[in-house]
A protein has these predicted regions:
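Chalcogenol-based redox active-site neighborhoods
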Residues: 1-181
């Protein structure tokens, strides 16, 4: 079953950000572009941390989510120089409720698959990627995908081709285009 256009369910979770605990709810993600990043490894978190200001500059917030507690996130932050670079919220999902809602929970292991989800300002999933646990994700491609999602949201008569970047040509689906690509 596809998650595209699925509305994110109501939630309230504890998070660790800026050396403090806070609560994050569905209301916090509405009105901006959000990227939810489940089951993470340090290299991916660092990649996102290095690109965090770029995401913020296009009105996007990053949330990393794991099935650990917010206390585990703080302990990890305190022990790892890599994790100390993170400025975005690290959401705790110890019950797996968010992982189940995003359909990435591995029940037999009590953990989530690696997934990246782009949620529009209305709270609907517009793009996602779920990959094997032994393959890392790329923040540059995720950033490009957010930009493309933002573009087509405001240009509903156009689509962004592979490798599209802001300012590049888009396509306007039509009968005249069929068979020409």
């Amino acid at each position: 079953m596809s998650l595209i256009n699925k509305e994110v369910s109501e939630f309230s979770v504890q998070a660790f950000q800026d050396n403090a605990f806070k609560t994050v709810t569905k209301a916090d993600i509405l009105g901006k572009w959000s990227v939810d990043f489940t089951f993470v490894c340090p290299t991916e978190l660092e990649d996102l941390a290095e690109k965090y200001e770029d995401f913020k500059s296009i009105g996007c917030e990053i949330y990393s989510v794991s099935c650990d507690s917010h206390f585990v996130h703080k302990a990890w932050h305190d022990a790892s120089k890599t994790i100390q670079k993170i400025k975005y919220p690290m959401l705790a999902d110890p019950t797996g409720a968010l992982a189940r809602d995003f359909d990435v929970m591995i029940e037999s292991e009590g953990m989530a698959e690696r997934g990246s989800f782009i949620v529009n300002p209305e709270g609907r999933i517009v793009a996602y990627e779920v990959i094997a646990g032994n393959v890392g994700r790329n923040a540059d491609e995720l950033f490009r995908r957010v930009q493309a999602s933002q573009f087509v949201a405001s240009h509903d008569d156009q689509v962004c081709p592979a490798k599209w970047r802001p300012g590049a040509e888009t396509l306007k689906p039509s009968l005249d285009l069929v068979g020409l690509l």
